[in-house]
Curated annotation (Swiss-Prot):
GO biological process: intracellular signal transduction; protein homooligomerization; protein ubiquitination
GO molecular function terms attached to this record: cullin family protein binding; identical protein binding
Residue ranges of every copy of the KHA domain listed in the record: 3-82
Species annotation: Homo sapiens (Human)
Domain BTB: 89-161
Function: Substrate-specific adapter of a BCR (BTB-CUL3-RBX1) E3 ubiquitin-protein ligase complex, which mediates the ubiquitination of target proteins, leading to their degradation by the proteasome.
Keyword Phosphoprotein: yes
PANTHER family noted in UniProt: BTB_POZ DOMAIN-CONTAINING PROTEIN KCTD9
Domain of life: Eukaryota
Quaternary structure (record): Forms pentamers. Component of a complex composed of 5 subunits of KCTD9 and 5 CUL3.
Pathway(s) served: Protein modification; protein ubiquitination
Sites bearing Phosphoserine, chain numbering: 11
Keywords: Phosphoprotein, Repeat, Ubl conjugation pathway
Name by which UniProt lists this protein: BTB/POZ domain-containing protein KCTD9
């Protein structure tokens, strides 16, 4: 069995010892696998082309090419090799016309699977062009490359002012610096204006109220007040349409003529609140407390809670003369001792609702569901014309 030492064309370093068998094509296949190239021809140390396997002797030194002419390793015009091995070799990169000097270990060790590591981990493997100073030419943006090189040096992402992080991210993706990509994506996300969905506090809202003239309508549509303490505030005529007021404390608040259409009031406390002329169409007040509230407007303006979800609400002792609760859901609600004179309860779900002690004079209960409802101690008897079924 014969064995030979294979080198890349023009390089006397990092050779591979292989066994010679079969044909010249077999040797080229082995050379391609060992050296990571597409070998097409083999030369001896004197530049002679080997075209027959029989010409190869034991312990020959051969140079493998990818089709380029033979380069004598002793007269190679490339900069001289370092004396301490390739992991400490200094090299210069010409990136977009700007020079960067670093070591192979910097480019290889931090991200061994990156493009830069594959380009420089073995000398001579990468056949890129070099300029007149021997610097490797890389056609990329130097201002975006500098943060990447510094990251490979010390592992910290440092980007100077005025440099777009998106540009650095694209360069990191190009060179395959995976760990840096994660850092950059986080940095870009943190640099964006925050999408603040946190609830508005009482202090912030009071500041809005003080800055708004009393005759101007404050627009709070769709805002998040979840859990806020808005008790005892003057909230007249404010547009809370589709706002999140869940678990809010609105006790003793003045919500006269406020628009709470489709608002979320679930779990909120509105005890003793002034709700004259309030608009609460299709609002969700499930589990809320509305004890001793006043819905009755002396001017005749009626509160509108049509289609509202009032499951399990506690409205005990509230004044609701003329209120519109058409097709609302009051299942398991507590309406003890409420004044519901002239109220519209047509199509309302009153299943298991406690209406004991209520005044339902002239109230419209046509088509309402009163299954399991409690009508004890009524102030006025229900008339057949009210059509309870």
């Amino acid at each position: 069995m014969r064995r030979v030492t294979l080198f890349l064309n023009g390089s006397p370093k990092n050779g591979k010892v292989v066994a010679v068998y079969g044909t010249l094509s077999d040797l080229l296949s082995v050379a391609s696998s060992k050296l990571g190239i597409k070998a097409t021809s083999v030369y001896n140390g004197k530049g002679g082309l080997i075209d027959d396997i029989a010409l190869i002797r034991d312990d020959d030194v051969l140079f493998v090419c990818e089709g380029e002419p033979f380069i004598d390793p002793q007269t190679d015009s490339k900069p001289p090799e370092g004396l301490l091995g390739f992991h400490t070799d200094w090299l210069t990169l010409n990136v977009g016309g700007r020079y960067f000097t670093t070591t192979r270990s910097t480019l290889v060790n931090k991200e061994p699977d990156s493009m830069l590591a594959h380009m420089f981990k073995d000398k001579g493997v990468w056949g890129n062009k070099q300029d007149h100073r021997g610097a490797f030419l890389i056609d990329r943006s130097p201002e975006y490359f500098e943060p990447i090189l510094n990251y490979l040096r010390h592992g910290q992402l440092i980007v100077n002012d005025g440099i777009n992080l998106l540009g650095v991210l694209e360069e990191a993706r190009f060179f395959g610096i995976d760990s840096l990509i994660e850092h950059l994506e986080v940095a870009i996300k943190n640099s964006q204006p925050p999408e603040d969905h946190s609830p508005i506090s009482r202090k912030e809202f009071v500041r809005f109220l003080l800055a708004t003239p009393t005759k101007s309508e404050l627009r709070c549509q769709g805002l998040n007040f979840s859990g806020a303490d808005l008790s005892r505030l003057d909230l007249r005529y404010i547009n809370f349409k589709m706002a999140n007021l869940s678990r809010c404390n609105l006790a003793h608040a003045n919500l006269c003529c406020a628009n709470l259409e489709r608002a979320d009031l679930s779990g909120s406390v509105l005890d003793c609140a002034n709700l004259q002329g309030v608009k609460m169409l299709c609002s969700n007040a499930e589990g809320a407390s509305l004890k001793l509230c006043n819905f009755e407007d002396p001017s005749g303006l009626k509160a509108n809670l049509e289609g509202a979800n009032l499951k399990g609400v506690d409205m005990e002792g509230s004044q609701m003369t003329g209120i519109n609760l058409r097709v609302a859901t009051l299942k398991n609600a507590k309406l003890k001792n409420c004044n519901l004179r002239g109220a519209t309860l047509a199509g309302t779900d009153l299943e298991n609702c406690d209406l004991s002690g209520c005044d339902l004079q002239e109230a419209n209960l046509r088509g309402s569901n009163v299954k399991g409802a409690i009508f004890e101690e009524m102030l006025t008897p229900l008339h057949m014309s009210q059509s309870v079924r």
